[in-house]
Amino acid sequence: MIDFHCHLDLYPDPVSITRRVDAEGMYLLAVTTTPRAWQGTCSVVAGVRRIKVALGLHPELVAERHSEISLFRELLDDASYVGEIGLDGSAKLKSTLPLQRRVLEEILVACAQ
């Protein structure tokens, strides 16, 4: 089994999840919602072969965490995967759409370099 959308950093006990994934022979891509979470998640899954970690900046969090874009760029060279990026045009986040676009563009440019 492969799970391509798991926020391991949001589980209360991520270590137990890593053990279960390993024991059951599953594969998991842990998609982080912020660059800071990427660092912590990488530490939690160190040594677990079947779990990979994607560097992300969730569009829902861009308004409050856009200052982490510089950290995103710093970490990008060490990240094998990028995930949980994009745009959220829902009514709740519509006012942040211009900022989301700017941050997404910065991420895409950084990924292309």
Q: Can you describe what each PLM-predicted range is?
A:
Residues 1-113:
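Mid-domain alpha/beta scaffold segments of enzyme catalytic cores
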